[in-house]
Each structure stands twice: as structure tokens, then as C-alpha cells.
From Swiss-Prot:
Summary of the function given for this chain in its UniProt record: Catalyzes the conversion of 4-hydroxy-tetrahydrodipicolinate (HTPA) to tetrahydrodipicolinate.
Associated pathway: Amino-acid biosynthesis; L-lysine biosynthesis via DAP pathway; (S)-tetrahydrodipicolinate from L-aspartate: step 4/4
Gene: dapB
Organism: Campylobacter jejuni subsp. doylei (strain ATCC BAA-1458 / RM4099 / 269.97)
A biological process term (GO) from this entry: diaminopimelate biosynthetic process
UniProt-recorded name of the protein: 4-hydroxy-tetrahydrodipicolinate reductase
Length: 248
């Protein structure tokens, strides 16, 4: 049995992963780690670690991992460039998987949105994400991943064209503008819409998650797979290509 350590075990995703692991036949829980716990014990007793914590938590995890390399499956969102750079550096000595969303449906949405962005170059792009009232970061990591994909498909720098809100008399929408909007309320697990709008028609691509178990089960499958991989950086596409279930 592969021993999985859960880093950020008290969070919503941490609790969901713990629950899903109870019925997993290939893996079991080694340590439930929360802030202030024993990192040395986490690394010693785990074959692979799943991280759904916070940006500061992920930063701490990566720093410690350099002293005791272990496969890391990271799903924490809101990471800045400093942490992403640290992640890339650490992946030279251990396998690291990072994704802002670990569902097959979102991977396909990202692929389709990129293709649509290329094919519908004259269409305006707007992205809307909806989550529960407790979500701390905005826009969601998934929304930003989608925005990066559609911008890249048009050879645009997202930082120069992204709009995160509109208010007052702001003038007409610019040609290359990509809006990323956030809604928060209730217990919405996650809904992402990428819309392409032109005079007389529009196309909207949607993905809705109805249970966190979708992401938890995905994270567990990825962690099991990652435990057998060599040191490098991995993405959701690497995982799905390995399964040969979809070519992205």
C-alpha cells in the first residue's frame, strides 16, 4: 500500500481526501498534517504527499522537501511567482505535480477553450467562475489557468489584457480584453464558464463540479501515479496522457 500524507488535513479538500482514502485499495493515510505539526514525521512516514493548504503552507512544504525529497502532489491555489519558481527548482530532485484543478472535465474544458480561442479570433472572451462563500482567493486558480490558455492561444500576454472588474463609465471594451470575473455564495463547489461572444452569436463552454470528491479522487489517483515517477515537473496533461484516456 502506498502511504499518502495529507498536508493541510483540516481544510475542506484535506477532509475530503481523508474520507476518500478510507475506501482506496491502493493507498492509505500515513499522516494527517496541519500547521505546527511535525514535518519530519510527515516526510519519514509518507511515500507521497498531497498538499491542499495555503500559499504560505506550500512555501514551507517546498522548503522542507529540499532536505528530504518526496513526491509532492500540489493543488493549493493562489501561488505567486516566487513559490512557482521554488517549485520548479525543487522538481529537479523530486517529482512534483501541480494543477489548479484535478478533474478530467476541467482538463478537457481547458483544451477546448484554447482551441476555440484560436478558431474564434474575432470573438470577445469573458470568463466567469463561481464558488462557495468560504473560498478565500479570487479569481480561482482554475479561472486563471483558463485565462492563460486562451490568451496564449492568441499570442497575448494575459497580464496586459486581463480585466478583473468593471465599474462606472469605462468606455468600450477593447479588442483583446479578457475579463475574469468571480462570484461567491452558498455552497457552490465550483463552476467555470468560458464565453466567446460575437455580433449575432456566442459560444459558452461550462464545467460544473457538484462534489469535492471529484477533486479528491483525482488527487489520490495522481498521487499514486506520481509516487512511481522520476524527478521533474508534471501537469494534468502528463497524467491523462499516461492513462491514454484523452489526448490533450
Amino acid at each position: 500500500m502506498i502511504k499518502i500524507g495529507i498536508y493541510g488535513a483540516k481544510g475542506r479538500m484535506g477532509k475530503q481526501i481523508e474520507e476518500c482514502l478510507k475506501s482506496e485499495t491502493q493507498a492509505e493515510i500515513s499522516i494527517l498534517y496541519n500547521k505546527g505539526g511535525n514535518l519530519e514525521e510527515l516526510f519519514e512516514k509518507s511515500d507521497v504527499i498531497i498538499d491542499f493548504s495555503s500559499p504560505s503552507g506550500t512555501h514551507e512544504l517546498l522548503n522542507y522537501a529540499r532536505t528530504m525529497p518526496k513526491p509532492l502532489t500540489i493543488g493549493t491555489t493562489g501561488l505567486d511567482e516566487k513559490i512557482l519558481h521554488l517549485m520548479q527548482s525543487a522538481s529537479k530532485v523530486m517529482p512534483i505535480f501541480y494543477a489548479t484543478n484535478m478533474s478530467l472535465g476541467v482538463a478537457v474544458l481547458n483544451y477546448l477553450a484554447s482551441k476555440a480561442s484560436q478558431m474564434l479570433r474575432n470573438f470577445d472572451i469573458e470568463i466567469l467562475e463561481m464558488h462557495h462563500r468560504h473560498k478565500k482567493d479570487a479569481p480561482s486558480g482554475t479561472a486563471m489557468t483558463l485565462a492563460q490558455s486562451v490568451a496564449k492561444a492568441r499570442n497575448l500576454e494575459l497580464e496586459k489584457v486581463r480585466v478583473s472588474g468593471r465599474d462606472g463609465i469605462i468606455g468600450e471594451r477593447s479588442k483583446d480584453e479578457i475579463a475574469v470575473m468571480s462570484l461567491r455564495g452558498g455552497d457552490i463547489v465550483g463552476r467555470h464558464t468560458v464565453g466567446f461572444y460575437e455580433d449575432g452569436e456566442f459560444l459558452e463552454l461550462n464545467h460544473t463540479a457538484t462534489s469535492r470528491a471529484t477533486f479528491a479522487k483525482g488527487a489520490i489517483k495522481i498521487a499514486i501515479w506520481l509516487s512511481k515517477q522520476e524527478a521533474k515537473m508534471y501537469s494534468i496533461n502528463d497524467f491523462f496522457r499516461n492513462l491514454k484516456c484523452v489526448q490533450l
